[in-house]
C-alpha cells in the first residue's frame, strides 16, 4: 500500500513538472536552474521573452528610477521606452516593508502572483526581478526588444492585489 502511495506521489510530481504552469513558473524564476550558479548560466543563455531579455549592464541607454512605497504604489507607475533600448531600473524602496519589481506580461504577473499566494512568499532570483529590502535600492537591467505594453508588479502576497502594478510602454 505504501509503495502505491509513493508511486502516485512521484507520478503527480512528474505531471506537474511537465505542465504549462511549471513552464510559466520556470520563466519567472521559480523553476529548476533559477538559483545559484545555475541561474547565472541560464540568464546568459535565456530565451527572449515577449517583453525582451536581460540587458547588458555595460550597454545601458537610460536609467529610470522607480520608487516603491508601503501605499502599494510605484512612482512613476508608467514609463515609456524605445524598442531596442537597454534600461537600468534603479528601484528604491521608500517603505518599511519589502517590495519587488517583476517585469512581465499581465498574464505572467497574475499567474505568478497566484502561485506566490498559494505557496507563500517564495523569494526567487531571475533577470526580470529586483527584490528590495526596506529603505534600500535595487537594480534591474532589461532590454526591450519588442514594441508593446508590458508591466511591472510587486508579487509579494497582497501587494499585487492591492494595486502595486506599473506599465511599460515600448514604441
Predicted regions and their residues:
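Envelope-exposed proteins and targeting segments
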Residues: 60-64, 83-87, 97-99, 128, ...
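Beta-strand signatures of extracellular beta-sandwich domains
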Residues: 100-104
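Short aromatic-acidic-glycine turn motif
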Residues: 107-118
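Extracellular/periplasmic metallocenter environments
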Residues: 23-47, 73, 127-171
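Short beta-strand and strand-turn-strand segments in soluble, beta-rich domains
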Residues: 117-126
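Asparagine-centered strand-capping/turn motif at beta-strand->loop junctions
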Residues: 91-93
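N-terminal edge beta-strand
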Residues: 56-86
